[in-house]
UniProtKB/Swiss-Prot annotation:
Family: Belongs to the methyltransferase superfamily. RsmH family.
Residues reported in the UniProt entry to bind S-adenosyl-L-methionine: G36, G37, Y38, D54, F81, D102, Q109
Function: Specifically methylates the N4 position of cytidine in position 1402 (C1402) of 16S rRNA.
A Pfam family this chain is assigned to: Methyltransf_5
Any single biological process term in GO: rRNA base methylation
Region (Disordered): 298-331
Coiled-coil spans in chain: none
GO CC terms: cytoplasm
Keyword tRNA processing: no
PANTHER family referenced in this protein's UniProt entry, alphabetically: 12S RRNA N4-METHYLCYTIDINE METHYLTRANSFERASE, S-ADENOSYL-METHYLTRANSFERASE MRAW
Catalytic reactions on record: cytidine(1402) in 16S rRNA + S-adenosyl-L-methionine = N(4)-methylcytidine(1402) in 16S rRNA + S-adenosyl-L-homocysteine + H(+)
Major location category of this protein: cytoplasm
Protein name as catalogued: Ribosomal RNA small subunit methyltransferase H
Length: 331
């Protein structure tokens, strides 16, 4: 059954694709295929080709009908989007004309109870975008109290992180925590909320999801890969949904759109020329009509940039984010 809904318009989809300015003969990457919304919008320009990536096998299977409709203009690849440079190389594509990324969990994943992403449904505590690797239940069962607290604080920006971690460790001594309802109830006993507040478990669920899928590392690597495979004038458009994602995108584009690396005190150090030119200094946000139709659009921010002729910046040093493998070893 296809999950690529022809009626699906992704959050800020028309605005993001307008930033790409697709043209006849151009090749584009939809780095987060999902329900296929961005891909459809790009393919609406005759003569375009799209390489669409998703690590979720359900999304890839759901795109089969769209592949047929595209008459050879669409290639679907099941993979992490951090590997987009290698994916393009495997398709004999050295450079692409534009890349769109819609970062984070998809509506399709959130709304499927069996995937375990949401506290709105009682389901298995999974949260994996792919079918491999440790699940959120594995993390809850094995991580140390200190690591749990750090993950919930850093990835969830949750000020009650230590109390939540302490409650999780106490609860798992009594019984296995394997469902979303169990975890949400544990968190709700620690985080008190008033009417109108977000659900007490919102930040904890976000933190576990980010860790399980290594989302922020993935984003940083994907942005660096995009810088390498976009030619001069190639476009990058990124839609993010929470402050950590947006901070990474904003910082990346800010650093690469200004002259840097030199010093008036050490003039012999060569300055790094800007590798991107910003397309918007302030993020594009959804208008009232879109947020009414889709409340998830309220937090969305779109940032874009065009590649310059300057060489790509050297890769950043290793990430400082908590790593899934380290957390799983620490329990």
């Amino acid at each position: 059954m296809s999950t690529a809904d022809p009626r699906h318009i992704p959050v800020l989809g028309p605005e993001a694709v307008a930033m790409l300015a697709p043209r006849d003969g151009g090749t584009y990457v939809d780095a987060t295929f999902g329900a296929g919304g961005y891909t459809r919008l790009i393919l609406a320009t005759p003569g375009t080709r799209v390489i669409a990536i998703d690590r979720d096998s359900t999304a890839i299977a759901g795109g089969a009908d769209l592949v047929g409709e595209a008459n050879g203009r669409l290639t679907l690849v099941e993979s992490r989007f951090s590997a987009l440079a290698e994916i393009c190389a495997a398709q004999a594509v050295g450079q692409v004309d534009g890349i769109v990324m819609d970062v984070g969990v998809s509506s399709m994943q959130l709304d499927t109870a069996a995937r375990g992403f949401s506290f709105r449904f009682d389901g298995p505590l999974d949260m994996r975008m792919a079918d491999t690797g440790p699940s959120a239940a594995d993390v809850i069962a094995q991580a140390s109290e200190r690591d749990l607290a750090d993950v919930i604080y850093i990835f969830g920006e949750e000020r009650h992180s230590r109390g939540i971690a302490r409650a999780i460790v106490a609860a798992r001594k009594e019984q296995q925590i394997t469902t979303t309802r169990q975890l949400a109830d544990i968190v709700a006993r620690v985080v008190r909320s008033k009417p109108g507040d977000i659900h007490p478990a919102t930040r904890t669920f976000q933190a576990l999801r980010i860790l399980v899928n290594e989302e922020l590392d993935e984003l940083e690597q994907a942005l660096s890969a995009a810088e390498r495979i976009l030619p001069p004038s190639g476009r990058l458009a990124v839609v993010s949904f929470h402050s950590l994602e947006d901070r990474i995108v904003k910082t990346f584009l800010a650093e690469r759109s200004k002259i840097g690396g030199g010093s008036r005190h050490l003039p012999e150090i060569a300055q790094q020329a800007p590798s991107f030119q910003l397309l918007n200094r302030k993020p594009v946000v959804a208008d009232e009509a879109e947020t009414v139709a889709n409340p998830r659009a309220r937090s969305a921010k779109l940032r874009g940039a065009a590649r310059t002729t300057a060489p790509a910046h050297p890769p950043s040093s290793s990430s400082a984010w908590p790593r899934l493998a380290d957390v799983m070893r620490g329990g």
